[in-house]
Amino acid sequence: MKFTQIPTNTFKELQLNAGILTSNFTPATGTVESNNILGATSGGINFTATPSYTDLGDDIDNCPKNMMELKKLDSWEAKISGTFLTVNTAQAKSLLAAADVGGSDTTKVTPRNDVAPTDFDDIWWIGDYSDKNGATNGGYIAIHMMNALSTGGFQIQSGDKAKGQFAFEYTAHYSMDAADTVPFEIYIKAGTEEA
């Protein structure tokens, strides 16, 4: 059949497995410190980046809707969501967004009614990419969410003879210090042969 085909480079451009969430990543070297992995997840990770547009020709007579010359991009909404299977006090604080870990009792996490600048933090999702994904030179897709804040709250779903599940959602935020900087970046790097 003439159109039952796939691109010849398909197997070099596949993203594989669930990936990981980390607090830090170095794209230049493709290295992750294991102590920066935020937690074990289940069911994979979902990232969405949705633009918000204004149609400046919307109220102009004789102007068709969605005239490309009059389309204005207002902002981006970038979210990442999934389910953690592991949790500790640092992760609970992060999921609550506005919260503090106790100074004298480090087992206690107390929510606040105000958001502090320190509640925002960068989050990276990194997944294996390409047909060459060895331990040293493996390819990756990485998404850097800047100024991320938990907007899904703290949730736990327990079950009989099951692991507890902690659903999460983080939203990237613009900053007044760099209002023109879109708060996410995407890196795609093909792997190379291992030495």
Please describe what each predicted stretch is.
Residues 2-5, 12-22, 122-128, 137-144, ...:
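Ordered hydrophobic segments in well-structured contexts
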Residues 71-73, 105-110, 168-172:
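Glycine-rich loops and low-complexity Gly/Arg-rich segments
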Residues 140-195:
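Mixed-charge, glycine-accented linear interaction segment located at domain edges/termini
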